């Protein structure tokens, strides 16, 4: 099994990916945007859940794009486009991406604009991961203004490690998972 090539700030922890993807409700054949893709680890797991997924991995950081490209190659992810630039610009172009079914947002720069573009692209579900309270508040406000806010989940994971012949837990940084769903 290949190891994920990492970048600063990533990859997203497996437990966070599991909860985030469960909230997305991916279906076979979906068009999936991974905004602020980092290492591409969320896309890799998404591809394991839904067959024939079309992936749009978006990031402005060169190191992230290179890591994603390497990880996609190592994990056999073929039906993916890696897109360089600001997500709000890329999502705003009809030529680049015509529609999106589900989106994971790991990078939260310009979150209001990104969410608006995803709604324009007809995304039925959007999940945003955030670690800062201010980002959570901005995300909730933006989702409410777009009439897509569903819920926020606070996830705190601790990992065991040995100490003095016994086991202790060390907490990871908590993550807020903000969920938006298209209202029927």
From Swiss-Prot:
GO terms for biological process: anaerobic cobalamin biosynthetic process; methylation. Pathway: Cofactor biosynthesis; adenosylcobalamin biosynthesis; cob(II)yrinate a,c-diamide from sirohydrochlorin (anaerobic route): step 8/10. InterPro entries: CbiT, Cbl_synth_MTase_CbiT, Cobalamin_biosynth_MTase, Methyltranfer_dom, SAM-dependent_MTases_sf. One of its GO terms (molecular function) is cobalt-precorrin-6B C5-methyltransferase activity. The keyword Calcium does not apply. It comes from the Archaea. It holds the Pfam family Methyltransf_31. Keywords: Cobalamin biosynthesis, Methyltransferase, S-adenosyl-L-methionine, Transferase. Its EC number is 2.1.1.196. It catalyses: Co-precorrin-6B + S-adenosyl-L-methionine = Co-precorrin-7 + S-adenosyl-L-homocysteine + CO2. S-adenosyl-L-methionine binds at residues 12, 36-40, 59, 87. Disulfide bonds: none annotated. PANTHER family: COBALT-PRECORRIN-6B C(15)-METHYLTRANSFERASE (DECARBOXYLATING) (PTHR43182), COBALT-PRECORRIN-7 C(5)-METHYLTRANSFERASE (PTHR43182:SF1). Belongs to the methyltransferase superfamily. Archaeal-type CbiT family. This is Probable cobalt-precorrin-6B C(15)-methyltransferase (decarboxylating). It comes from Methanosarcina mazei (strain ATCC BAA-159 / DSM 3647 / Goe1 / Go1 / JCM 11833 / OCM 88).
């Amino acid at each position: 099994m290949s190891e994920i090539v990492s970048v600063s700030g990533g990859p997203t922890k497996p437990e966070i990916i599991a909860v985030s993807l469960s909230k997305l409700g991916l279906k076979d054949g979906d068009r999936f945007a991974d905004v602020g893709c980092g290492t591409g680890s969320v896309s890799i797991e998404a591809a394991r859940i839904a067959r024939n997924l079309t992936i749009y991995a978006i990031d402005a950081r060169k190191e992230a794009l290179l890591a994603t490209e390497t990880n996609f190659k190592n994990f056999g992810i073929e039906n993916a486009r890696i897109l360089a630039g600001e997500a709000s610009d890329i999502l705003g172009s009809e030529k680049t991406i015509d529609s999106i079914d589900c989106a994971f947002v790991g990078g939260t720069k310009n979150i209001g604009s990104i969410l608006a573009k995803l709604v324009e692209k007809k995304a039925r579900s959007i999940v945003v991961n955030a670690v800062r309270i201010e980002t959570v508040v901005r995300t909730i406000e933006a989702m409410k203004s777009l009439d897509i806010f569903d819920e926020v989940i606070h996830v705190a994971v601790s990992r065991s490690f040995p100490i003095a012949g016994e086991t202790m837990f060390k907490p990871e940084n908590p993550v807020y998972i903000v969920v938006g769903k298209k209202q029927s």
